[in-house]
């Protein structure tokens, strides 16, 4: 299999990300094997794949009968495996998409190190954990990479290819060629906290929270300023959409991993909201109040104010984008990723309207 794309793809974890990755693989003609310790999760995962394929077929303009045939034809490529060992024994590419728990992922990679074919590519979809910490326990670190898909995987074009110091260049090249063949845009980065997007985009929310903490600008002014600059949504709208708890967990992981620099210190406002169960759209309230359809109906009472603050929209943009640019320069100057890959990653992964290096 050396130098060739694997024909069989294994996906470990049948949650939202695992199912999405499996859908992408079968859409591109790969026989795909799915494993999850929870049999019910497998069934839910298959249902997600079917729904995703049906949406995709609908966008292709197929009629109802043709949609069913198209979906069924691709679903025939998807099957489940009872164990990790069974999956690993036949897959040329294994993508681990289990929960973001280092101990769990290390257990999986220990098993893969024993059971996978000698030339198999072993990948993790982690968004925050150390790829090297998984590679070392596998016993075959040269064949381990990160393949960080963005949610929803069938829709988002970006994949971060994360290489460790031990990753063999030929393995990284094979992984990149395969994922590019799935109509994804692949950017490379070294194994470091947050990779590209989750690190460089971090000041987008942190700097906004700092201004809110200091009473310098309101939630509405900050969000309006960034939308006016070409972003699809402002920092507070984004945190409510993603989940304030999810955003806080990522902020903590990057902050801890980089040695707790003050510039990336998580905000006490987020800590308080998470402690109160105010997680954004999924809980009904966060920085905004959300209706039954999930759409914001107004700013939450404790953030609503007739005073928009002393910092105008232009200064809000300068503060936030200045912090993003500074982080982008740090990543580029450290040799973790190229300027071009950083710019592409921010555009496709976080909706940035322009390069931070412009």
Language-model features: locations:
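N-terminal glycine-rich phosphate-binding loop for ADP-containing cofactors
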Residues: 1-358
